[in-house]
Swiss-Prot record:
Residues the entry annotates as binding AMP: 31, 36, 57-59, 86-89, 93, 156, 167
Chain sites annotated for binding ATP: 10-15, 128, 137-138, 195
Subcellular location(s) per record: Cytoplasm
Organism: Streptococcus pyogenes serotype M3 (strain ATCC BAA-595 / MGAS315)
Taxonomic lineage: Bacteria, Bacillati, Bacillota, Bacilli, Lactobacillales
Pfam (any one): ADK
EC class of the enzyme, as a word: transferase
Name assigned to this protein: Adenylate kinase
Family of this protein: Belongs to the adenylate kinase family.
Subunit structure comment from the entry: Monomer.
Catalytic reaction(s) noted: AMP + ATP = 2 ADP
CDD domains hit by this protein: ADK
Signal peptide range in chain numbering: none
InterPro entries: Adenyl_kin_sub (IPR006259), Adenylat/UMP-CMP_kin (IPR000850), Adenylat_kinase_CS (IPR033690), P-loop_NTPase (IPR027417)
């Protein structure tokens, strides 16, 4: 089974990806892991990626696409199938993935889209606070400290609501064309992500069993 998982930051995509890998035994292919492995193994694309990263530059699409292609061509993929997590990030990368899969004789079986209302995600992502003395992390709503005094805690700049909202806006603008592309191919299953983790996975599992 060859899968793609999508969802906005904070939707619980990583948690569900780990559960899918555990339950269905597919290879988990996350962008960060792929880059690290390609650079550690000094593959052609890994060396190219490292040359950009060492200069503090963004890795161009053609290199990212090349690293994905290298990984998808490995033997375990044909045996186990895969779950792509964090790629494609743009519609251009989605088209490149289509071409790669066709070239390798693979096909995408389904796209799991974890849906959570953006306003809920702002609350989830902007609630993180850090104790000034201990460095411990808490959440204003989901994991509040026992003796909360506002002056004892601070919030990182990228956890502030306006920053979180901007990040979500960027992700939505990039993600919608990708979802639309796969919807036209009849591959997308939307999963309600604003429920308990176990309930989310029950819905994911049901959808995947129907694909098998």
């Amino acid at each position: 089974m060859n899968l793609l998982i999508m969802g906005l930051p904070g939707a619980g995509k990583g948690t569900q990806a780990a559960k899918i890998v555990e339950e269905f035994g597919v290879a988990h292919i996350s962008t960060g892991d792929m880059f690290r492995a390609a650079m550690a193994n000094q593959t052609e694309m890994g060396r190219l990626a490292k040359s950009y990263i060492d200069k503090g530059e963004l890795v161009p699409d053609e290199v990212t696409n090349g690293i994905v292609k290298e990984r998808l061509a490995e033997d375990d993929i044909a045996e186990k199938g895969f779950l792509l997590d964090g790629y494609p990030r743009t519609i251009e990368q989605a088209h490149a993935l289509d071409a790669t899969l066709e070239e390798l004789g693979l096909r995408l079986d389904g796209v799991i889209n974890i849906k959570v209302d953006p306003s809920c995600l702002v609350e989830r992502l902007s609630g993180r606070i850090i104790n000034r003395k201990t460095g411990e992390t808490f959440h204003k709503v989901f994991n509040p400290p026992v003796d909360y005094k506002e002056e004892d805690y601070y919030q990182r700049e990228d956890d502030k609501p306006e920053t979180v909202k901007r990040r979500l806006d960027v992700n939505m603008a990039q993600g919608e064309p990708i979802l639309e592309h796969y919807r036209k191919l009849g591959l997308v299953t939307d999963i309600e992500g604003n429920q308990e983790i176990t309930d989310v996975f029950a819905d994911v599992e049901k959808a995947l069993l129907e694909l098998k």
